[in-house]
């Protein structure tokens, strides 16, 4: 009989707490429903960034770094050094859909995604001559690949072909380095997303 008062006290506390828990459950259920409707910010947030501009030629390394990877360039006496890699995630949407008329115009070095981006427009407008030289280089590259018979043209033609061969090899090296940079940026983006997902699951 010593346990009887204790059992009654426990039953009283249990029945007293039941309405409170029911009320708390009713108060929490709308919050749970509202949380279920709206996704959490961690799940929906992704570090995506659209291209700043679209280059006329992917062989223009400085333009590709500026438009696609948003890298700052430092002019040194020996060469141009890129640094400050921005967000690796980028949109693959072509700017031809946004500017169909301007995309066909290859006189500019690049086409900006936003007309309000004055820095981008000045960069693309200032690079008109570089873009023209790049187009000329591409045409020469195609002609070099097709081959030219220098047997009748003499030593100047042979010398020109040797110089063009060196330039072509250099441009191929630049193109390969750009492809490697894009591949590394893509791998970094995938690694970042995987780390973000695992971090959200653990917490």
UniProtKB/Swiss-Prot annotation:
Endothelin-like, as annotated region: 110-124
Function in brief: Endothelins are endothelium-derived vasoconstrictor peptides. Probable ligand for G-protein coupled receptors EDNRA and EDNRB which activates PTK2B, BCAR1, BCAR3 and, GTPases RAP1 and RHOA cascade in glomerular mesangial cells. Also binds the DEAR/FBXW7-AS1 receptor. Promotes mesenteric arterial wall remodeling via activation of ROCK signaling and subsequent colocalization of NFATC3 with F-actin filaments. NFATC3 then translocates to the nucleus where it subsequently promotes the transcription of the smooth muscle hypertrophy and differentiation marker ACTA2.
GO biological-process terms attached to the record: endothelin receptor signaling pathway; intracellular calcium ion homeostasis; positive regulation of protein localization to nucleus; positive regulation of smooth muscle contraction; regulation of systemic arterial blood pressure by endothelin; regulation of vasoconstriction; vein smooth muscle contraction
Family: Belongs to the endothelin/sarafotoxin family.
InterPro entries: Endothelin, Endothelin_toxin_CS, Endothln-like_toxin
Name of the protein: Endothelin-1
A single cellular component GO annotation: extracellular space
Gene Ontology molecular function: endothelin A receptor binding; endothelin B receptor binding; hormone activity
Subcellular location: Secreted
PANTHER family listed in its UniProt record: ENDOTHELIN, ENDOTHELIN-1
Residues annotated as glycosylated: 200
Native source species: Sus scrofa (Pig)
Domain of life: Eukaryota
Name of the gene: EDN1
Coiled coil: none
PROSITE patterns for the chain: ENDOTHELIN
One Pfam family from the record: Endothelin
Assigned keywords, A-Z: Cleavage on pair of basic residues, Disulfide bond, Glycoprotein, Secreted, Signal, Vasoactive, Vasoconstrictor
SMART domains found in the cross-reference section: END (SM00272)
Signal peptide location: 1-25
Organism placement in taxonomy: Eukaryota, Metazoa, Chordata, Craniata, Vertebrata
Annotated region (Disordered), positions in chain: 27-48
Proregion span(s): 26-50, 83-203
UniProt site positions, description: Cleavage: 73-74
Primary location group: secreted
């Amino acid at each position: 009989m010593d346990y009887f008062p204790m059992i009654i006290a426990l039953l009283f506390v249990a029945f007293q707490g039941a309405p409170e828990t029911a009320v708390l459950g009713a108060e929490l259920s709308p919050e749970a429903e509202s949380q279920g409707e709206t996704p959490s910010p961690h799940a929906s947030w992704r570090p995506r960034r659209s291209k700043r501009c679209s280059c006329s030629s992917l062989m223009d390394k400085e333009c590709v770094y500026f438009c696609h990877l948003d890298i700052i360039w430092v002019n040194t006496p020996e060469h141009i050094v890129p640094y400050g890699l921005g967000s690796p995630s980028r949109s693959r949407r072509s700017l031809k859909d946004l500017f169909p008329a301007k995309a066909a115009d290859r006189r500019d070095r690049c086409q900006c995604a936003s007309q309000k981006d004055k820095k981008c427009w000045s960069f693309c407008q200032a690079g008109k001559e570089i873009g023209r030289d790049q187009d000329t280089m591409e045409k020469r590259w195609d002609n070099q690949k097709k081959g030219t018979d220098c047997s009748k043209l003499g030593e100047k033609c042979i010398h020109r072909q040797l110089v063009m061969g060196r330039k072509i090899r250099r441009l191929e090296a630049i193109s390969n380095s750009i492809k490697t940079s894009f591949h590394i940026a893509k791998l970094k983006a995938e690694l970042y997303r995987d780390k973000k997902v695992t971090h959200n699951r653990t917490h």
